[in-house]
């Protein structure tokens, strides 16, 4: 759990910096995390801990690189229409006997918009943070969750 969700981000950031970003003194590092890194969720403690760790890494590294033109941010999607969400819905159905509609309703209940996040909404947030107009945004954990957080 920690290797996939925390160590991999650390190593990726480390490699990006070593591959020339640090020498150039400019660039964008963006981690895709989860709202679990902002608030946590029951029954996924290790996952939430790893995601909290990525946000801590993001904030600390942003401070270390603040005097360069390298920004470090995290995007924290809520429940997003992906295969991972499909597995979560199936898991709820299997463990609780709820219908698909009930399982989906349970997951969207925390989203004030009452829906799942679309993958392209997450991608657009990442693209903005990688773009030329985001130079003063660093050390942030941007929630893309329909107002959940």
Regions found by a protein language model. Give the residues of each.
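Active-site loop immediately N-terminal to the catalytic Tyr-X3-Lys motif
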Residues: 39-45, 67-68, 114, 132
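Residue(s) in the substrate-gating loop at a strand-loop-helix junction
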Residues: 34
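Catalytic Tyr-X3-Lys loop
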Residues: 1-11, 30, 54
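Short, small/polar-rich loop/turn modules that mediate ligand/substrate recognition or access, typified
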Residues: 66, 71, 137-139
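Active-site helix of classical SDR
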Residues: 13, 50, 58
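Active-site loop-to-helix junction immediately N-terminal to the catalytic Tyr of the SDR YXXXK motif
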Residues: 40-48, 60, 88
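C-terminal substrate-recognition "lid" of short-chain dehydrogenase/reductases
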Residues: 113-144
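Alpha-helical segment proximal to the catalytic Tyr-Lys
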Residues: 18-19, 63-64, 135
